[in-house]
């Protein structure tokens, strides 16, 4: 599938319509993951880049269109109102965490969100503009109006899809889960993508960079550091 560059509405612009009187409900699931094995078991969400923790940066990246936010991971103080949940059993992987988060969102309002933003906590260069582009790509008319995209996924410079920086139609994503929702332990994220109609959104300015090692963290801290004052 070819990458697209969708038109972008201003940050906080009006909701896409899914019906004449039913605005699309946009929610988000932020996945904090476990302790990074290449980080000596350190909790990624608590690491700081540019004076903010990775969790704070992820929450700040969520556009104003996102009404409800579920964080899959340990409960910690946050400035933005969020709900916390965990996949059962813990350690089931990102697909299990994402499905658990969507289940929490469904229980919160009594129905599924129309669109759900999935964002890994270890992508600190993702911004509201990134999420706006993904939402715009999902809502853009495709070549077949009867078969609209079911997911808009960020793609890095090497062409690798980033399924944890994406926007999904929640019902379509859950329909792609093989078997029952509670049997997602260890399910690869790529398995969920197999049955979905995807649109790829190219990353800009390092948006797809993630934190897997101490070297990654050092590089990202240097990248966002302000320039030294002129002598």
Label each PLM-derived region with a short phrase.
Residues 3, 15-186, 194-206, 214-218, ...:
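Nucleotide and nucleotide-moiety/phosphate-recognizing core
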Residues 210:
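PAPS-dependent sulfotransferase catalytic core
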Residues 219-220, 231:
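Acidic two-metal-ion nuclease catalytic site recognized across multiple nuclease folds
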């Amino acid at each position: 599938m070819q990458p697209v560059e969708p038109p972008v509405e201003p940050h906080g612009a009006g909701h896409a319509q899914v019906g004449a009187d039913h605005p699309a409900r946009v929610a988000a699931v932020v996945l904090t993951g476990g302790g990074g094995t290449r980080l000596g078991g350190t909790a990624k969400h608590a690491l700081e880049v540019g004076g903010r923790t990775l969790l704070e940066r992820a929450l700040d990246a969520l556009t104003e269109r996102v009404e409800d936010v579920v964080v899959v991971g340990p409960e910690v103080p946050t400035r933005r109102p969020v709900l916390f949940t965990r996949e059962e059993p813990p350690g089931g992987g990102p697909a299990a965490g994402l499905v658990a988060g969507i289940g929490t969102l469904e229980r919160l309002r009594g129905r599924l969100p129309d669109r759900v933003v999935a964002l890994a906590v270890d992508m600190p260069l993702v911004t509201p503009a990134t999420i706006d582009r993904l939402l715009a790509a999902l809502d853009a008319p495709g070549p077949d109006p009867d078969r609209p995209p079911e997911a808009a996924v960020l793609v890095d410079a090497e062409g690798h899809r980033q399924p944890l920086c994406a926007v999904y139609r929640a019902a379509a994503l859950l329909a792609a889960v093989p078997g029952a929702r509670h049997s997602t332990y260890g399910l690869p994220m790529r398995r969920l993508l197999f049955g979905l109609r995807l649109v790829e959104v190219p990353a800009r300015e390092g948006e797809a960079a993630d934190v897997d090692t101490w070297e990654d963290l050092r590089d990202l801290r240097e990248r966002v550091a302000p320039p030294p004052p002129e002598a």
